[in-house]
Every structure is written in C-alpha cells, then in structure tokens.
From Swiss-Prot:
Record protein name field: Phenolic glucoside malonyltransferase 2
Top enzyme category: transferase
Residues binding malonyl-CoA: 270, 272-273
Native organism taxonomy: Eukaryota, Viridiplantae, Streptophyta, Embryophyta, Tracheophyta
GO biological process, one term: response to toxic substance
Name of the gene this protein is made from: PMAT2
C-alpha cells in the first residue's frame, strides 16, 4: 500500500465571533476526563463507497463540501480546534481555545484495495493506521482533534479521525461526526438544536477529591516522574507486521440464542445485548490466549453517566461522562471452562446493575483501587465503542459508511463494539491481534455459535 499526502489543510470555524458569546476560551477537564489524560488517541475510520470517485470529482465536489461543512460545524464545536494545557497555577488541565484555533485535515490518496480494507476479514493493522492522522502532543500541549480524508480512486474514500480521549468520549465524538454529516448532506447553514453540544460543566457535581485521585492514578502510570505535569502520552505498544484487525459479527438470532444459554443457568441477570456480546467475545479472547489457567485476567468497560447523574446531563453534553468499572484479578480458568461464557455474563451483568445502584464516588474509588494493583502481565480486556452510538448513521450525502473501524484497539487489548450495519439488534465486534491468535479467536467464536 502506498499513501500519498496531497496537503494538510487548516480548517477554521466559519465565524469566530461565536467564541465570545459561548465563553469557551477555557474549558476545565472534569474527573470524567482526567483518567484518559495520557492515553493514546482514539482513532476511528469511516469508509464510504462511491459510484463516481475520480480524482476530479473528489477534489471539485466532495472535498470542498466536506471542508465547508466542517468549518460550519466547528462554530459549535470550538474545543475541537483547541488544545489541552496545564497552567502552573492551576490544579488540573483545561482545554484552551484561541482565535487562531484550527483542525488540521490531511488530504491523501491511497492505491490500496478499498473493498479489502473496508471489509470484515483480517486486514493489516498498519494499512488501517495509515488512514488516520497524527495527533501532536508534547509536555506542554496536547492537540484535541485531527482528521484525514483519503481518496481511493474509482473506489471510494475514508474519513479517519484522531481524538484526544480527555477531550471527548465516544458519544461526543459520534454525535459530532453525525452532526457534521447532516450539515454536509442537507447543506445546512446552522446546527440543528437537537445536535447542539452542551458545555455546562456546572451540571456535574462531585467531590473535588475525585479530581486529585484521578490525577494521581494517571501519574502512577508514568515511568518518568521528573515532570509530573507533562501531557506527553504514555508510550504506544510496538506491534509487528503480523498484527491484523478483524470484525466478527453476532446476528440478532445469535444474541437471542446466547441469551437463552445464560437464562437457563441464571434467569435473573441483566442480559442486554451489550452484556451478551461482551461476555461471549471476552471468553473467546481468553480461550485463544491459552496458557496457564491460573494466570490473572481482568475485564473492564465504561458506563455512560449522562442519564445517571442528578440532574441528568443533556444527551449532547460535550466531553467525557463515563466511569470505568471492572472485575480485577480473576483466574483465566473461570472463562476457559465450559461455563466460562455464563460466568462472564454474570460478572458483567452485576457490574452493569451496580452503575445505577452505587454512588459515583464509590464506583470511582473502586476503579482507582482495582486498576492500581494491576500487573502488566495480566490479560486486560476493555471495550471501545458501543452498540448505541449509531456510527452507521453518518451519511455525508454519498450514502452511509460501508464500514466503521476503531483502529486504536491495538493499544491495550481492547474489543471494539458497534451496531451491525445492516441488521437491527446485531453487533459488530472488532479485535486486533497477531494473525495466529486471531485465527484461534475466530475458530472459538464460530464454533461456539454452531455448537
């Protein structure tokens, strides 16, 4: 695969006068944002197939519409043009927006096979990463957001986004993409009210000590303690050429059959689609890793608290509003044995129930305590994305995406999750592994559905 970068455009909001009225020069991070301060960016790729995708058509029609609509929507998403800083006299970092803020948009062209890269089978991770831009970060400043638009001549194009996780979570990112798509497709001149982001941090009420706890947790992950205010990301995992990304699918019927398996053993559980899909994917993940059955494994996911706070936050709240919850230091044998799937479903069900029944301080304290005692040798499963984000609704005027991938699941053994593109109630599950291990996961996954 050869990628040719054509230009790096600096897209500014259409009218910066909005800054003054929005009072968004400075947006402090909350304790929901702080756990992600030093994590690698969240990287996602949207693939769009085109019936007409010549260079002339792309550069004269498609690209100008994408840039113009992006400029329009940035009026309402000013923090995406900013960067994170941690001023010497401040107890925690903030997002700073300036009048010369921009979103960098890389324009590129690829000679890769579009249908293969946008498919569901095993694809080289390196080729997918090439479709996502860099997100500049240093000790003193961390860029919030960047975009890459890549043309595959006579095939289609992709939109790759890199987002700093301390700036926005998956819901905010997905809402932004869908709002941008709507403005582009309908050629709107202003943001629909139901998509307008809310920046009111005063709605989030919590003890200030939680800020300090999250900052201490983040600091504990740094090897170099000489500059405790450094915003430089934690080192990324170095992956070989044999690492692939694949998307496995659970149909609605698959979910129902798996749900019945659990009900027959534990009828009183909370068995949402998320619980079933995560439990099944996780057990396949652990079985494929194999090894010592007494080895330590931990599983983690994040709960969205927009509807769980008092008062509730608007659905369009900008930023992170998630707390990680998890089950730590279990034995791999629990998930490798015959009833491993049911065990995983029981654990995840209890964790989901606890999101509504426990105080936010208790959940945060439990996360900090559990995460602090993790060993680097522990197999640690996490979830990126959700079946509720509606990522396949992002139609810019040339049809819905044929595929959406979260490329950053290569960092930390994450499992990506999204709604199935062409079936209500189905689930797409993305995994990133060495090819030999991926083959094993796929085998466990498919055999389990047909046994």
């Amino acid at each position: 695969m050869t990628l040719h970068v054509i230009e790096t455009a600096r897209v500014t909001p259409t009218d910066y006068s909005v800054i003054n009225s929005a009072n968004l020069h400075k947006l402090p991070l909350t304790f929901f944002d702080l756990p992600w301060l030093l994590f690698q960016p969240v990287k996602r790729v949207f693939f769009y197939e085109l019936t007409e995708s010549t260079r002339d058509h792309f550069h004269s029609i498609i690209l100008p519409k994408l840039k113009d609509s992006l400029s329009l929507i940035l009026r309402n998403y000013l923090p995406l043009t900013g960067h994170i800083t941690w001023e010497p006299n401040e107890p925690k970092p903030s997002i700073i927006v300036s009048e010369n803020g921009v979103v960098l948009v890389t324009i590129a062209e690829s000679d890769a096979d579009f249908s293969h890269l946008s498919g569901y089978g095993q694809r080289p991770l390196s080729e997918l990463h090439a479709l996502v831009p860099k997100l500049p970060v240093s000790d003193d400043s961390a860029t919030a957001f960047s975009i890459q638009i890549t043309l595959f001549p006579n095939q289609g194009f992709s939109i790759g986004v890199a987002a700093h996780h301390a700036v926005l979570d998956g819901k905010t990112s997905s809402t932004f993409i869908k709002a941008w798509a709507q403005i582009c497709k309908q050629e709107l001149q202003s943001m629909p009210e139901n998509l307008t982001p809310s920046y009111d941090r005063s709605l989030i009420k919590y003890p200030t000590y939680l800020d300090e706890k999250m900052i201490e947790l983040v600091r504990s992950l740094k090897e170099d303690q000489t500059n405790i205010r450094s915003l430089t990301s934690l080192p990324s995992s170095k992956l070989g050429d044999d690492v692939v990304l694949a998307t496995l699918v659970l149909s609605r019927a698959d979910i129902e059959r798996l749900r019945e398996q659990v009900k027959n053993v534990s009828p009183s559980l909370h068995l949402s689609t998320f619980v079933i899909a995560y439990a099944y994917a996780w057990t396949c993940f652990v079985k494929a890793r194999g090894g010592n059955k007494d080895r330590s494994v931990s599983l983690l996911f994040v709960g969205d608290f927009r509807d769980r706070l008092d008062p509730k936050l608007p659905g369009t709240y900008f930023g992170n509003c998630m707390i990680p919850v998890g089950c730590y230091n279990r034995k791999a044998a629990e998930f490798m044995e015959e009833k491993g799937f049911v065990t995983a479903a029981e654990i995840i069900s209890d964790l989901v129930k606890g999101l509504s029944s426990r105080k936010i301080e208790t959940i945060a304290d439990t996360f900090v305590e559990g995460f602090s005692f993790q060993s680097w040798s522990t197999q640690f499963g996490t979830i990126a994305g959700s079946t509720r984000l509606g990522v396949y609704e992002a139609d810019f005027g040339w049809g819905r995406p044929v595929k959406v991938d979260i490329v950053s699941i290569d960092q930390g053994e994450a499992i990506a999750m999204a709604e199935r593109r062409d079936e209500s109630g189905g689930v797409e599950i993305g995994m990133c592994l060495k090819k030999t291990e991926m083959d094993s996961v796929v085998s466990f996954f498919n055999n389990g559905l047909h046994s």
